[in-house]
């Protein structure tokens, strides 16, 4: 336990908070190129084939990001925009691909939560 004089001489070291999305480097979104598009299985107790992509960002960092929504048009060399946001049942997936921007198409026949999936308003 330090004395008050010791604290005046040298203050306590600040404990820095761990960043949840370090690859974004404090930006809201980042652009990148898909290097691999594949499916993976979630951890227990869930069961599915989740669509994910390995993305090399413009800052040179390569991350795994989730492709939300039903169906997608992504393949290798597709240019995508990613945002933060993890997928709880996929270890190591801390980013989401934004639908409806750059090479990523919006989800077709989407009626609700359209803005989150880049879907236009149905006529």
Curated annotation (Swiss-Prot):
Residues 101-123 are annotated as: Disordered. GO terms for molecular function: rRNA binding; structural constituent of ribosome; tRNA binding. The modification 3-methylthioaspartic acid is found at residue 89. Keywords: Methylation, Ribonucleoprotein, Ribosomal protein, RNA-binding, rRNA-binding, tRNA-binding. Pfam families: Ribosom_S12_S23. Residues 113-123 have a biased composition (Basic residues). One of its GO terms (biological process) is translation. One of its GO terms (cellular component) is small ribosomal subunit. The keyword Metal-binding does not apply. It comes from the Bacteria. The keyword rRNA-binding applies. Belongs to the universal ribosomal protein uS12 family. Part of the 30S ribosomal subunit. Contacts proteins S8 and S17. May interact with IF1 in the 30S initiation complex. With S4 and S5 plays an important role in translational accuracy. This is Small ribosomal subunit protein uS12. It comes from Solidesulfovibrio magneticus (strain ATCC 700980 / DSM 13731 / RS-1) (Desulfovibrio magneticus).
